[in-house]
């Protein structure tokens, strides 16, 4: 039985591509200034609030610093229970450590959780932690990883399909 969901943040829940160059430079002050321009993908908030209403725990596992994740989630009113940022695990994705840390914080077993992400590193991290993985390929940047995502348990090509996917768990 599914009791929790783990999500990547950037290009999975929000389109943060406007800040991509600043992120590459690790210029977090510039990145923060772009947060109001980030767009939550269509249907994402509805899906997350529905998950909450079903009693599912929600974790965000990101390769970005926790402070950034908190700012994005707060600004865009995205619900969550647990955050695992770049510095919160002993090794970053694609290591299993961020996923295992999220599982510990949610007090759930891998078989009770489904993970959602847009990159191969999300899939590798999830699968190596024993967590089912759903590929979220609605962003144009995800196309680079499309071939590698063939090992995902499910592939979603449109963000509005997220709610339907979660409603079935």
Residue positions per predicted region:
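Glycine-rich phosphate-binding loop signature in dinucleotide/nucleotide-binding domains
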Residues: 54-56, 106-112, 169
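Acidic, Mg2+-coordinating phosphoryl-transfer loop and its flanking beta/alpha structural elements
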Residues: 115-157
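Conserved Lys-Pro-Asp/Glu-containing loop-to-beta segment of HAD-superfamily phosphomonoesterases
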Residues: 96-123
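A short, structured active-site edge motif that brings together acidic residues
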Residues: 78-93
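Short, acidic loop-to-helix structural element flanking the phosphoryl-transfer center
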Residues: 32-60, 70, 74, 96
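Conserved phosphate-coupling serine/threonine residues in phosphotransfer and NTP-handling enzymes
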Residues: 62-64
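Conserved Rossmann-like nucleotide-cofactor binding loop
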Residues: 12, 19, 66-67, 121
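Active-site neighborhood of HAD-like aspartate-dependent phosphohydrolases
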Residues: 1-40
């Amino acid at each position: 039985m599914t009791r929790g969901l783990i999500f990547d943040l950037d290009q999975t829940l929000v389109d943060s591509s406007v800040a991509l160059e600043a992120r590459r430079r690790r210029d977090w002050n510039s990145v923060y200034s772009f947060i109001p321009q980030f767009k939550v993908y269509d249907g994402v908030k509805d899906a997350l609030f529905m998950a909450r209403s079903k009693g599912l725990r929600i974790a965000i596992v990101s390769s970005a610093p926790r402070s950034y994740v908190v700012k994005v989630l707060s600004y865009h009113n995205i619900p969550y229970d647990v955050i695992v940022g770049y510095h919160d695990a002993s090794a970053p994705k694609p290591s299993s450590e961020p996923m295992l840390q999220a599982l510990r914080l949610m007090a759930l077993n891998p078989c009770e959780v489904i993970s959602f992400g847009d990159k191969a590193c999300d899939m590798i991290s999830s699968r190596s932690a024993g967590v089912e993985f759903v590929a979220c390929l609605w962003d144009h940047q995800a196309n680079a990883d499309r071939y590698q995502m063939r090992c995902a348990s499910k592939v979603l090509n449109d963000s509005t399909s997220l709610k339907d996917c979660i409603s079935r768990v």
